Each structure stands twice: as structure tokens, then as C-alpha cells.
A protein has these predicted regions:
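Catalytic cores of carbohydrate-active enzymes across secretory and cytosolic contexts
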Residues: 1-476
């Protein structure tokens, strides 16, 4: 087992995916091949982990016994085992059928099961034990997201010497919603085991502070509360993307050529409207489809001049809510294409599959309008990726007010996804915006994201955590 790491990341998943082919970029361990996962979190933390001989603890993604610890690109990886039952109860159940919908404003009713809670607790205990075992004395441990909310307190009980941070990537709900959680006090105490609890938005931090006072009587002042003789800070750290990497990808001649090819395959329409989402009920896919259908029915948009491309990446396919959502979305797509499509020219090109980073960049480059209309979202990095990919090409972003990104991307065409007329109005303003105005808006958003990228996010969080620990950042 890995020992003595000064910096430990604890997340549901490892930052690698197992591969079955001979991918050149993959690494071999114990007869199994791995490649780094795409994603901003991995990109942001890789330099810190590599520099400080850090360790990442997480599940490999495959049920069954865990592989032995191994190393990829200078980062020590400690795989966690999850049985089929644990995947069903801890991950698909408590994490994604209970906590996920509850934290997203009950967009779908959460399901409460005692056996799910018990398994969630046991899995969190194993993650905490693994972190306690590998962390060096006085190490910094950064716990990630809603699947592991009990870990900070469990870890502090075993290793009070550690500096513990926690970051929640999804929204944190108001008191009246959180109080529905049968495990509410246990989850709150779990989070209070951290020295710093980070949220995507200031409202999430405020909800957390108010909840702590309401449920546990914990006094707070500003962003700091006192709990069991310790000070715990709750602050907002809006996550971002690797802006430079997405811009480089979008500037690649092969990606540019692919973008032209995509437009040609779509019939060279005047306006390409794009949606890229996990197939999730929080993303508002149905709402944007209905808005598009009504604009076609009103005659404000027409096929083939305007077409929509909706990428709906498969997600949590064994969870009942997600199965039902797929049926609804595909029924709506069929209705639109039946009513407004033409021979060889569907109104909506619906793609229920995953895409590579380069193909997504090509889609961003090909799209005149990007629609990001979640009913509730912690941040939404797709909106930021679209902005980064546009370079000097203008384009327009239609963005839900309920995405965390709306707090930063104020030059987007903001809308309330529950207000269908408002969504239609925002889409039409985006479609008809003057080219110069589109470039101006996009330029302002790009300047912001260039400065506030994912590396800045990680640095800001770790700086704040180190300050709480009474040390400089080089504590790591």
C-alpha cells in the first residue's frame, strides 16, 4: 500500500479509465491497461499531485475486487473495490436516486431507502480508512463531491492531524429541502469534519451555514462557523475549464475541417443550434426541444434554414428516472421531426452517444447557437467550453439562470427554463443577434474564462485551505 503522501485526493472515481484495446496513451498495471480520463478536475490537480508525489483514491469503474495500487504519469492511484450490490445501493441508489435529485431542487422526487443509506455509510467509511492509511502526517486531503459527504468526519476521527478540504460540485439545497433527507444530521456532521467546505456558488455556502445553525445550533460569523472546538470555513469556488486546452483544440486544423464537414452533413443550414448534455432530468433537454418546436410551429424558425443537434450522452442507465427521461426526450424528438422535418433533413439530429473531446470541439465550432438550459446545475462546464472554442468567431450562448455559470457568463442570453416563452425569446435573440454584438459578448466572456480557468480554481481552493491550516501553500 502507498504510504506517506503529503497530498491526497479522494473521489468516487479514479482519474483513469480502463481500456481493452492497445491505445498508445494507455498504461499497464497488473495486466490491465489504463488511460487518463478527460476532465477539468484531473487536468487541474495533475500538476499538484505530480509535484508533491500525491495520491488519488477512487473506484476503478468496474464492480469487483480492486486492482493493486499503481502509478500513472507520476500520480499514485489507490483503487477502491465496489461490489455489484454496492454500486447499486451506494452509487445508483443513495448517491444518484436520493442525494442527486434532492440537491437539484427535487426536479424529480428523491427515493429514500434504508439499505441505501447503510451502504453509503459503509462505502464512505472504507474511503476514509484508505485516506487515513496513505496520508503522511499533517497531509492535505481534498475530498470530492456528494458521493463522499461522510468522509471528512470519518477521516478526522481517525487522523485529526490532517488538513481536510471538501468540494461539492453540485448545488447545495436550501434548508427546507435538505431537511427531507433522513440522514440529514449525519451528512451535515460529515461535511463539518472538513476545515474548508467549498461550493460552486455563494448561495450554496450560505445555505450550508444557515443549515448548520438550524440543525445543530452551530454559530457562525461571515463564512466561518465553530464546531466541536474547531473553525470551519464555507466559501464559494466556482469551478472552470482548461481554457487554453479547449482553445488549442478548437484551433486545430483537423477540428476546423471537421466543423465544416459537420455543417455540410447538416445541409449547410443558416443556423445550427446545439445542445450537449448528459441525458439527465436536471438538464432541461425537454424544455429546449419544446421551445424549438413552438418556434417552428410559429414560423419564426424553419427547416432546413435552422436545425438543432442534440447530443445526449448516456448516463446512469440503470436508474429508473433516467430510463423514463430517455423515453420522453426521444418521443419529443420524434414528434418534432414528424411535424417539421423534410426528406433527408430532420429538424432535430438526436445523438444518444458519447463523443471525444475533438469531436465535441468540432461541434462547438460548427454551432451558431449553444443552448444550455438546466433546471438546476452546480456550474455547467459545457457552456464554458463553448465560449472557449469560439475564438474570434462570435456565436451565441443561451444559458439558464439556474446554472452556476450564469453568475459569471452575464453576456449570455439568459433565460428561465421553466418559462417557455422566455426560452423562445432568448433563442430568437441569439439567432438574430448582430454579428458585431455577438463577437463583443463572446470576447467579454472569453476574457473572464481565460483568467478564471480550472488551474486558478484549484489554486484558490488550496490556498484558502492552506491558510486555514496556518501555513503557506508550500505545506503540500
Amino acid at each position: 500500500m502507498v504510504q506517506g503522501s503529503p497530498f491526497v485526493v479522494v473521489a468516487n472515481r479514479l482519474p483513469v479509465d480502463e481500456v481493452t484495446d492497445d491505445t498508445p496513451s494507455s498504461r499497464t498495471s497488473g495486466g490491465r491497461r489504463w488511460r487518463p480520463s478527460p476532465g477539468g478536475l484531473v487536468t487541474a490537480l495533475h500538476p499538484v499531485l505530480a509535484e508533491h508525489k500525491g495520491t488519488w483514491i477512487g473506484w476503478s469503474g468496474t464492480p469487483g475486487p480492486a486492482p493493486d495500487p499503481f502509478e500513472v504519469d507520476g500520480i499514485k492511484l489507490v483503487p477502491m473495490s465496489l461490489s455489484e450490490d454496492e454500486v447499486e445501493r451506494y452509487y445508483e441508489g443513495q448517491s444518484n436516486a436520493t442525494i442527486w435529485p434532492l440537491y437539484h431542487d427535487n426536479v424529480e422526487p428523491p427515493i429514500f431507502r434504508r439499505r441505501w443509506r447503510d451502504t453509503y455509510r459503509e462505502v464512505n467509511r472504507r474511503y476514509a480508512a484508505a485516506a487515513a492509511k496513505v496520508a503522511a502526517p499533517g497531509a492535505t486531503v481534498w475530498v470530492q463531491d456528494y458521493q463522499l459527504q461522510l468522509v471528512p468526519a470519518m477521516l478526522r476521527e481517525q487522523r485529526p492531524d490532517l488538513l481536510i478540504g471538501f468540494f461539492l460540485h453540485i448545488p447545495f439545497p436550501p434548508i427546507e429541502l435538505f431537511m427531507q433527507l433522513p440522514q440529514r444530521a449525519e451528512v451535515l456532521r460529515g461535511l463539518l469534519g472538513a476545515d474548508l467546505v467549498g461550493f460552486q456558488q455563494r448561495l450554496g455556502a450560505q445555505n450550508f451555514l444557515r443549515l448548520s445553525k438550524h440543525l445543530l445550533g452551530t454559530p457562525y460569523s461571515g463564512s466561518t462557523l465553530e464546531y466541536e472546538g474547531r473553525k470551519v470555513k464555507a466559501e464559494a469556488f466556482p469551478i472552470s475549464i482548461d481554457f487554453a486546452e479547449m482553445q488549442r483544440l478548437a484551433d486545430n486544423p483537423l477540428v476546423r475541417e471537421r466543423a465544416k464537414q459537420i455543417r455540410a452533413e447538416l445541409g449547410d443550414p443558416k443556423t445550427v443550434i446545439l445542445g450537449v448534455d448528459r441525458l439527465d432530468y436536471t438538464k432541461g433537454i425537454e424544455h429546449r426541444l419544446k421551445a424549438f418546436r413552438e418556434l417552428l410551429a410559429d414560423g419564426k424558425l424553419s427547416v432546413p434554414e435552422s436545425v438543432m443537434v442534440q447530443v445526449a450522452t448516456p448516463s446512469r442507465e440503470r436508474v429508473e428516472h433516467y430510463q423514463a427521461l430517455r423515453v420522453k426526450v426521444e418521443r419529443e424528438v420524434g414528434r418534432i421531426n414528424g411535424d417539421f422535418g423534410k426528406v433527408g433533413v430532420p429538424a432535430v439530429h438526436y445523438l444518444h452517444q458519447s463523443y471525444s473531446r475533438s469531436e465535441l470541439a468540432a461541434l462547438y465550432c460548427a454551432a451558431d447557437v449553444m443552448m444550455v438550459t438546466p433546471l438546476r446545475d452546480g456550474m455547467n462546464l459545457v457552456a464554458k467550453e463553448y465560449v472557449a472554442a469560439r475564438a474570434e468567431n462570435g456565436g451565441a450562448l443561451v444559458l439558464s439562470e439556474f446554472a452556476g455559470a450564469a453568475g459569471e457568463l452575464r453576456q449570455a442570453f439568459l433565460c428561465n427554463p421553466h418559462d417557455l416563452d422566455g426560452v423562445k425569446d432568448a433563442l430568437m435573440r441569439a439567432v438574430t443577434v448582430d454579428e458585431g454584438e455577438a463577437r463583443r459578448r463572446m470576447s467579454i466572456m472569453q476574457r473572464h474564462l481565460r483568467k478564471h480557468d480550472v488551474a486558478a480554481w484549484a489554486s484558490e481552493f488550496l490556498d484558502s485551505l492552506a491558510e486555514i491550516g496556518g501555513t503557506e501553500k508550500n505545506r503540500l
